[in-house]
Amino acid sequence: MLIEKLKYMLAPVDPTGASTHQENDFGLLLEPKLRKVFYDTYKEVPEQFSKIYNVKTSKKAKETDYGVGAFRPWTQFGNKMSTVGDSTSMPQVKYQKIHPGLERTYVHEEFASGFMVERKFVDDEMYDVIEKLPKDLARAGRYKVELDAVTPFNEALKATPTANIYDSQPLFSHTHPLVETKNADGTTITVKGDNLIDGTLSADTLKAALLLGRKQVDEAGKLIVMSFDTLVVPPALEWLAMELTKTTGKPGTELNDINVLKGSLNVIVWDFLTKEDACFIMDSKNHQANFFWRVKPDFQSEKDFDSLVKKYNGYMRYSYGFSDWRGFIGIKPNA
């Protein structure tokens, strides 16, 4: 059974009329009367996902990151106001134990596409359209990468996300659970991880997001340092983002107040963000949004021996996701 399955998987694709580009499908491309053919004449959107993700190369079938807890604040040792009696035990150090966290697994998925062209169409076509087909195939592959990379952010910026990250919470949440649940003295750690501001982009919500950035905590609830330096917005918020971060005067007023947000953040306009009233800030150096190339786009071509049909295909393999929610703070309406 396995051998038969492998034979089926490895069997070459036989060209058919329906799957092959033929002269009869593009008859006008064989005639010299056309002034211009509109194909592959538009500029491609530059690569954007690499401005957001840490782009890495993988040599394994999957990549796994692992989180652990953290030590809690020390407890008092002894009593400075009294002497230990002869029959009383001396103070003892309270030893802590860090707890295991959660795995973050990146499983690389495969993507492929291609096209076929009959021999005489290659010979007779007069406008170099066929020569442009491989270029457009590569362009379509790059577009697929952009669509995939933005998907978890578009999902997280929804009013009610349905997809969660490794900790069973949306990427942007008020209640990210911490690994450690008890302090060294046995009391409950009540702090939760919070990286969400409810509301639309404004001077007030942006200030609130930056303030929240100073309140980020580790897995034991201890304050940590994150340097939020970038505001990522959809095209619909580009001009507002520029007003908030680039103008000298306070936006929206005729007073001579200074704009305290000026120069505080770089702005990235991510054309593939679809939620027009939501955005996020990020620490571009310390965030853990990762994109792994297992196989970068690889292209090949061959001629079918019997049909003389020319085949072109491309293949790529990658994964992406988050190893930590820290490093991102969302600003979005909650309804």
What are these regions (language model features)?
Residues 13, 17, 24, 83, ...:
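Amphipathic, alpha-helical segments enriched in basic
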Residues 154, 158, 219-224:
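Surface-exposed acidic, glycine-flexible loop patches that form ligand/cofactor-binding
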Residues 102-161, 231, 312-314:
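Long, contiguous amphipathic alpha-helices that act as assembly "spine/axial" helices in icosahedral shell
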Residues 43-111:
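Assembly/oligomerization interface modules of large self-assembling protein complexes
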Residues 35, 99-100, 216, 297:
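Short alpha-helical segments and helix-capping/turn motifs at coil-helix boundaries
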Residues 1-56:
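Extreme N-terminal leader/anchor segments
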Residues 2-16, 28, 169-219, 225-335:
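Sequence/fold signature of self-assembling virion shell proteins
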Residues 70-76, 82-86, 93, 105, ...:
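Signature of extracytoplasmic/envelope-associated structural regions
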